Amino acid sequence: MQIHSSIADLRSALKNRGRVVFVPTMGNLHAGHISLMTQARAHGDTVVASIFVNRLQFGPNEDFDKYPRTFQADCDKLAAAGVDVLFAPTEADLYPEPQEYTVEPPAIQNILDGEFRPGHFRGVATVVLKLFNCVQPQAAMFGKKDYQQLMVIRNMTRQLALPIDIIGGETVRAEDGLALSSRNGYLSAAERTEAPRLYRLLNEIRAAIRAGETDTVKLENEAIAALTAAGWKNDYVAVRQQSDLSMPKGVNAPLVALAASRLGSTRLIDNIEI
């Protein structure tokens, strides 16, 4: 696996490499990330990963400096997964001057996760566009676990006419249904036992809608009540349209149920397509 930090070296390394599939990460990799690398192989000739902890997407109450940096272990995992090229820029490489030009997503950045993490999706969209310009891939993989992020990137790519196919990678789960996340490591043993409740409740919402329930607000409120009774502190449980995460206009269009809630001090997110 080649490792490059400079944009010029990266572009030189990617000449004549066929169809390039790009998987951006912030490092601290787990099996969910590695699954994206494996899925990417089926969509192109060359798989490029990136590791960059992006300061722009951290909010005022989110500690950029405490984000785990596990670079050597990440490199070993990526090489074992068959990644061809790793782009690992420093802040000076990617932001050689203050980033005064940014990507401002529309209203989607202010709902759901965006309501609780103001400015987050502006930072995500800006760094992803910049990484796209560095790598110049033909396709890019983003996990469906971060569903709102996937929609922001997919819609940005379409509206800015970027020649990149955005592919949603399926969420990898533990045997009990908990979505794999670096945050799971912060759960106590008791919290880890409780954590799959979030996915079970999303499954119950999907089952109810498929069985004919049309009152999505009632389903949301029932799930919130169940989480609260079990000691969770909820940000949201929401049923939305898949395409743009707007409020559902009936239950016949493709929908997604999404949730974000805190178990102890750990904020967990999950979703399920309906």
From Swiss-Prot:
Q: Which reaction does it catalyse?
A: (R)-pantoate + beta-alanine + ATP = (R)-pantothenate + AMP + diphosphate + H(+)
Give the transmembrane region(s).
Answer: none
Q: In which pathway does it act?
A: Cofactor biosynthesis; (R)-pantothenate biosynthesis; (R)-pantothenate from (R)-pantoate and beta-alanine: step 1/1
Q: Which UniProt keywords apply?
A: ATP-binding, Cytoplasm, Ligase, Nucleotide-binding, Pantothenate biosynthesis
Q: Which domain of life is it from?
A: Bacteria
Pfam families, alphabetically?
Pantoate_ligase (PF02569)
The active-site annotation reads: H33
Residues that bind beta-alanine: Q57
Record carries keyword Transmembrane helix: no
For ATP, which residues are the binding ones?
26-33, 143-146, 172, 180-183
Tell me which Gene3D superfamilies the record gives.
Answer: HUPs (3.40.50.620), Pantoate-beta-alanine ligase, C-terminal domain (3.30.1300.10)
Q: Which SUPFAM superfamilies match?
A: Nucleotidylyl transferase
Checking NCBIfam families in the record gives:
cyt_tran_rel, panC
**Function of the molecule:** Catalyzes the condensation of pantoate with beta-alanine in an ATP-dependent reaction via a pantoyl-adenylate intermediate.
Q: Give the note.
A: The reaction proceeds by a bi uni uni bi ping pong mechanism.
What name appears for this protein in its UniProt entry? Pantothenate synthetase
**What is the originating organism of this protein?**
Dechloromonas aromatica (strain RCB)
- Gene that specifies this protein: panC
